[in-house]
Amino acid sequence: VLENIQKDYVACYSFYKIAAESFKKAGKKKQIIDGLEKSADVTLKFNHDLGEVLGMPPQIMTKKTKKKIDEFTAIAKKDFSSLANQYGLMCKKLVENQKQRIDYWEAKGNKIIK
């Protein structure tokens, strides 16, 4: 469960950073960009906090994060809306209510065990 949540944080950090950069380039309102960057900061902090709990060295966390950013950047260049559709709502929920996502992974894990 914790490893899956940590992967979600990496994905959401990457999503928020790319979204903020895309919105900057598109000339969107500063308030929207600031919100995306704040969400990126929150997910990065939780990513690293959880990585430490899991015993993951900082250089490994950085490498995984960079890899995910590169992956999402490639997707966003082709079709940003598909990236937003896949991660936007999930990441918003993760930032607003972590317990909901933990419950999701626990339920999914329980289905596999049964």
Report each predicted region and the residues it spans:
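Short N-proximal segments of mature Sec-exported proteins
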Residues: 2-55
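Compact alpha-helical subdomains of small soluble proteins
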Residues: 35-114
